[in-house]
Amino acid sequence: MNLILMGLPGAGKGTQAEQIVAKYNIPHISTGDMFRAAMKAETELGLQAKSFIDKGALVPDEVTIGIVRERLSQEDCIKGFLLDGFPRTVAQASALEEIMKDLGKKIDYVLNINVDSGLLLTRLTGRRICKECGATYHLEFNPPAKADVCDKCGGELYQRSDDNEETVANRLDVNIKQTKPLLDFYEELGYLQSINGEQDINKVFADIDVLIGGLA
């Protein structure tokens, strides 16, 4: 099974990715992991990526796509993979189609975890972190026993500056605008599957499981 996982920040992508790879024993491939592995192995493309990252520049598409091609050609991807964080643009998605064709494979599903942006705002702005031990809480979903105090060490809880409402709302807006052309592209190809991410975590996975179970 060859899957792509999509979803806005706060949609619960990471949790679902963990459950998918655990059950189906396929590699979870994120852009960051691919870059790190290629740089560590000092492949030609890995060294090229490193030169851009070290300068704080964006890695060009041709380098990123080359690294993706190398990764998807590896033995552990024979039975399938879960791509996370790639592609980000229609140009990258088109390049991925070419890679899959060259490998004699195809993408089975693009799983988009759908959550209303208002709920995402609540999820993302409610996070609080302990200044002392780094424990994470959520005002609505996982509140501390005593307001603003860590249950574990008694430290003070704070909100990260990039978790404030205005910053989060802007981040979501940018993500929605960037993601829409990609979703349209995959809908046209017939790959796109929308998953209701507003349900309980286990119910979200149950819906994914029903969908992809036949591919195993």
Curated annotation (Swiss-Prot):
GO CC annotations on file: cytoplasm
First and last residue of the signal peptide: none
GO molecular function: adenylate kinase activity; ATP binding; zinc ion binding
Location of region: NMP: 30-59
Catalysed transformations (reactions): AMP + ATP = 2 ADP
Protein origin, superkingdom: Bacteria
EC number(s) recorded for this UniProt protein: 2.7.4.3
Keywords: ATP-binding, Cytoplasm, Kinase, Metal-binding, Nucleotide biosynthesis, Nucleotide-binding, Transferase, Zinc
Alphabetized InterPro entries for the sequence: Adenyl_kin_sub (IPR006259), Adenylat/UMP-CMP_kin (IPR000850), Adenylat_kinase_CS (IPR033690), Adenylate_kinase_lid-dom (IPR007862), P-loop_NTPase (IPR027417)
Listed pathway(s): Purine metabolism; AMP biosynthesis via salvage pathway; AMP from ADP: step 1/1
LID as annotated region, ranges: 126-163
Residues at which AMP binds: 31, 36, 57-59, 85-88, 92, 160, 171
GO BP terms: AMP salvage
Localization per Swiss-Prot or TrEMBL: Cytoplasm
Enzyme class of the recorded protein, top EC level: transferase
Binding site residues for ATP: 10-15, 127, 136-137, 199
PROSITE patterns per UniProt: ADENYLATE_KINASE
Assigned protein family: Belongs to the adenylate kinase family.
Comment field on protein domains: Consists of three domains, a large central CORE domain and two small peripheral domains, NMPbind and LID, which undergo movements during catalysis. The LID domain closes over the site of phosphoryl transfer upon ATP binding. Assembling and dissambling the active center during each catalytic cycle provides an effective means to prevent ATP hydrolysis. Some bacteria have evolved a zinc-coordinating structure that stabilizes the LID domain.
Physiological role: Catalyzes the reversible transfer of the terminal phosphate group between ATP and AMP. Plays an important role in cellular energy homeostasis and in adenine nucleotide metabolism.
HAMAP family: Adenylate_kinase_Adk
PANTHER family registered for this protein in UniProt: NUCLEOTIDE KINASE (PTHR23359)
Quaternary data: Monomer.
Name of this chain's protein: Adenylate kinase
UniProt lineage: Bacteria, Bacillati, Bacillota, Bacilli, Bacillales
Protein's gene: adk
